[in-house]
A protein has these predicted regions:
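Mixed-charge, glycine-rich, non-catalytic linkers/tails in nucleic-acid processing enzymes
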Residues: 3, 8, 134-147, 180-349, ...
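Acidic, glycine-rich two-metal-ion catalytic cores of nucleic acid-processing enzymes
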Residues: 21-28, 40-79, 88-93, 99, ...
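Core structural elements
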Residues: 119-120, 207-223, 230-257, 272, ...
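Catalytic palm subdomain of template-directed nucleic-acid polymerases
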Residues: 156-160, 216, 249-273, 616-629, ...
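Polymerase palm active-site segment centered on the conserved acidic dipeptide of motif C
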Residues: 216, 266-300, 304-305, 638-654, ...
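Cys/His-rich microdomains that often coordinate metals
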Residues: 550-555, 572-575
Length: 883
């Protein structure tokens, strides 16, 4: 008794809010469990929430790392139960697992009519699925009609709101019901384990039962707001729910990392970073006429006798994790302690930042730590770098990425070392955010778990958050923001080779497995064309810009535009080359024959991307590096050429001003709260969003719908052990596929992504196309189009030549034998239809059997030469597989 008295004294004092006296918050027991389940089943919808030992819902060996402690149910907005299941304190109150399985099996049965409503089901459902709650399987969570989520509704109502989406904030804001915080119950920051609480302690029940009750009340309010707002559509809510299931599958699939390759990439990256850092210091010191190297860098260089923190690029990934960041920190501490920098300053008059005229006197340090943004800004001022921008809050020079890139681009001619500053920052980011975490954070199974958030961006696009939370970093949690990994495309000379190092670290996980990356080819320009109906661009998408051949604009039986061939009869792959169309509009048809045509086409490409989504002459100036006058001239020429596109911009602006929002092709609302603002900057930003938002948002809707369809198809075909969806980055979805099914799977996936009626039947004139790449790593893919053409080589970075220019080498890319069968294997009739060959004497027929890659190449060339010919296999027309 006395021990109980002392235990009560140690418990914190918790305030019971007034609203809690007006509802029933009940401790669940063996005696009332059946009654509570019956009440939930009898209701149309009930609140549901779980308490856990922690937040780690990663799955190993069929179980989550943390586990369920208890579950809360609210059959009505005025009544809720909390059923303890895994409490260590007060364990005598736990419901026996035999009863849990039986009763919750009834509640979560797929045939149960009543639906649970969660707040963030993405978290709860994984715990429920992998902690023994579903003896009948998990079909309930796969069916988006069987559950609701207040977090999704709140996001869709106001996607631009970045905070205030938590249950406690919503309960207070919408219901006037303040909730108890977990740190009130468990003040110790190191212990956030609900199992340490005794469920017989009333505040434990108040907290846990309030969650489902408040969730149900918030749902009733948010659902009403969503239904009553005519601009919102249930189709988008259902799309987000369907996508959530596929994202959960993707999270469970995880990403395999070749740690040895990552380690070597880290060493090479650190070597490049070290060289770049020294080059920046040498360049700035030469301009200023004094050595600005701080002592911590001298320590790292080994120039200070007796100092211990000497930098070695190979020093990464060992037990001490002495990566460059840690070595910099240690060297700074050593320098501060034993070798402090000189405190003298140099006073100079320099131009005011961001002002047209005027100077001010600044005390500059003798040496600089350019790894510090503040000191880097000071260095720029002493160097008299032009076009610097000052922060409105601090007055210091802004050195953020985009701003700095603009400054560098304008100043690089007079200050060549500025390009080295940009390269140094890129290398620092690549190492710190990607390569080093690839080495240090990989889990015991060799994988990382990216954290994809489908409810972060107002456009609907995914974001991938980095984290430093211990429960997310340890054993495979992910610090890597995958969305930030740049594409390694055709503009290789403009991108540091380290990009390929990042992608090379993502690998297939063993023999027989291949990475397959499928991305929507030029999707945003295709969407701009479809949304604006610009006739010149519609025409261009069916025309070869090299020979001028025009392909027919036809619809299939599902009212989906038929795809154009990848290669023209002339051998060119430039069908739908809008950049050539724009360049010809600027410079004339004869410009194609000029020596600088490549640069002129590049300007056309830059203008397309700068202006298509609502940009101005300033955007042209930034993109192609021209004068302000030329930027405005090109803007006027662009709008004068593409009049329908310009009218669409105006329509979007007018609609946005009238309604305060615009929509994607699928009905997603893009709020524009500032489009009628007096503030020119805010107004201009929302005017750009009125054009750009529907384009990016429609692209996001397409990707999310494709992911949902892919999950269902993989489940239907029983491919979960042969096909994994591991990443979605920009307009690309990355899979890991076993070669046993790869030949069959690729046509299924590409048809789902580009030809499915739900995606492509939007009344569009221009088809969606996808590109397929395959490889053992994400960085060395084999383009499927090239495979069909018989190509075997790929260019990859191979250091630099004597002039410092990047070199490339051809490598042989291995291809699975089963990939050759893609040319003749049949997919399902539903996903990859192939029509019976009909007798058409005017069309030559090429009958094939099983093909080698060289034979497949010859068939493809025959089909190009005999336009309209038929390739026949097993009495089926398989011509489409060679186009």
């Amino acid at each position: 008794m006395f021990d109980d008295f002392l235990a009560d004294l140690r418990k914190p004092s918790i305030e019971k809010y007034d609203w809690m006296n007006d509802v029933e918050l009940i401790l669940g027991t063996k005696e009332n469990l059946t009654q509570a389940i019956d009440e939930c089943i009898a209701s149309e919808i009930y609140g549901c929430d779980i308490e856990t030992t922690g937040l780690d819902n990663r799955v190993f060996d069929g179980r989550t790392v943390d586990s369920i402690v208890g579950i809360g149910l609210a059959p009505t907005p005025d009544k809720a139960y909390y059923f303890p299941i895994g409490h260590r304190a007060g364990s005598e109150y736990n419901i026996p697992w035999s009863m849990v399985g039986k009763e919750f099996g009834r509640l979560f049965h797929p045939d149960t009519k009543a639906n649970p409503v969660f707040h963030n089901i993405a978290f709860d459902s994984v715990f429920l699925e992998y902690n023994g709650f579903f003896p009948l399987g998990v079909d309930r969570w796969d069916d988006h009609k069987k559950w609701e989520d207040t977090l999704i509704v709140k996001y869709l109502l106001n996607p631009r709101q970045k905070g205030g989406r938590g249950l406690k904030a919503l309960s207070d804001q919408l219901c006037g019901m303040k909730m108890i915080e977990l740190n009130e119950l468990i003040p110790d920051e190191k212990i956030k384990d609900y199992a340490t609480l005794d469920p017989s302690w009333e505040p434990c029940v108040w907290y846990a039962a309030a969650d489902p009750l408040c969730t149900l009340r918030v749902w009733n309010i948010l659902r009403g707001q969503y239904v009553d707002a005519p601009e919102h559509s249930d189709s988008i809510y259902n799309l987000e729910k369907m996508c959530l299931v596929s994202v959960s599958w993707m999270h469970r699939s995880r990403v395999y990392v070749d740690r040895n390759r990552a380690l070597e990439s880290c060493k090479e990256g650190q070597r490049l970073w070290w060289e770049s850092l020294l080059e920046v210091y040498d360049g700035a010191s030469e301009i200023l006429g004094r050595d600005i190297t701080p002592n911590y860098l001298r320590i790292m260089k080994g120039e200070i006798k007796g100092a211990i923190n000497i930098f070695e690029p190979d020093d990464v990934g060992n037990d001490s994790k002495m990566s460059y960041k840690i070595r910099v920190d240690e060297a700074r501490k050593e320098a501060k302690r034993n070798y402090p920098d000189p405190v003298q300053v140099i006073s100079k008059n320099v131009a005011l930042v961001g002002k047209e005229a005027g100077t001010e006197k600044i005390d500059f340090p003798i040496v600089y730590d350019i790894m510090s943004p503040q000191q880097l800004g000071l260095l720029f001022r002493e160097l008299k770098v032009p076009n610097l921008i000052a922060s409105e809050k601090s007055g210091q020079v802004v050195t953020a990425g985009d701003v700095l890139d603009d400054v560098i681009e304008k100043a690089e001619k007079d200050f060549p070392f500025m390009g080295k500053v940009k390269n140094l920052r890129f290398l620092s980011k690549a190492l710190g955010q990607y390569l080093i975490p690839f080495v240090e954070d990989v889990g015991k199974d060799g994988t990382l778990k990216p954290r994809f958030d489908q409810f972060a961006a107002d456009t609907g696009r995914f974001s991938c958050k980095s984290t430093s939370k211990p429960w997310e970093v340890k054993d495979g949690g992910c610090r890597v923001p995958f969305q930030g990994i740049p594409a390694y495309g055709k503009d290789k000379d403009k991108k540091p080779a380290i990009i390929s190092y990042m992608r090379d670290c993502i690998a297939s996980r063993g023999d027989g497995w291949w990475l397959v990356a499928i991305d929507y080819a030029g999707v945003e320009l295709r969407l701009v064309t479809n949304l604006s109906k610009e006739p010149l661009w519609v025409k261009a998408f069916f025309e070869c810009s090299d020979c001028g051949k025009q392909y027919p604009q036809e619809m299939n039986d599902d009212n989906i535009p038929k795809a154009t061939p990848t290669y023209c009869v002339c051998g060119s792959d430039r069908i739908g080359d809008l950049h050539t169309v724009t360049a010809v509009a600027f410079y004339g048809e004869n410009a194609k024959n000029l020596p600088d045509w490549k640069d002129k086409r590049g300007n056309g490409k830059g203008c397309n991307f700068a202006l298509s989504y609502g940009g101005t002459g300033k955007a042209v100036q930034r993109t192609i590096g021209c004068s302000a006058q030329e930027g405005e001239e090109k803007y006027r020429k662009f709008t004068g050429t593409y009049k329908t596109l310009a009218k669409w911009w105006t329509h979007q602006h007018d609609f946005g001003r009238k309604h305060g929002y615009v929509k994607t092709a699928f009905g997603r609302v893009q709020p524009l709260p500032d489009i009628n603002e007096g503030d020119f900057r805010k107004k201009s930003k929302d005017e750009r969003k009125a054009v750009n938002g529907p384009v990016q948002g429609t692209s996001a809707d397409i990707t999310k719908l494709a992911m949902s369809l892919i999950y269902k198809e993989v489940k239907k075909r029983g491919w979960f052990d042969k096909l994994k969806m591991i990443l979605t980055v920009h307009d690309e979805i990355v899979f890991e596929i076993h070669e046993d099914v790869i030949g069959e799977a690729i046509p299924v996936l590409t048809n789902l992504m580009s030809r499915n009626k739900g995606i492509a039947n939007q009344g569009w004139a221009v088809p969606l196309l996808v590109d397929v790449e395959i490889g053992k790593t994400w960085g060395v893919p084999y383009d499927l189009k090239d495979l069909k053409r018989g190509y075997k080589e790929k260019l990859v970075p191979d250091g630099v030549d004597e002039e410092g220019k990047k070199k490339y080498k051809e490598i042989q890319v291995p291809v699975p034998e089963s990939l050759g069968r893609i040319f003749y294997e049949q997919g399902s009739e539903e996903q990859a239809p192939k029509k019976e060959v009909k007798s058409e004497p005017s069309k030559p027929v090429y009958t094939i059997g099983e093909l080698t890659k060289e034979e497949a190449r010859n068939v493809a060339l025959w089909l190009v030469e005999n336009e309209g010919g038929i390739v026949q296999y097993n009495n089926k027309d398989v011509s489409a597989l060679f186009i």
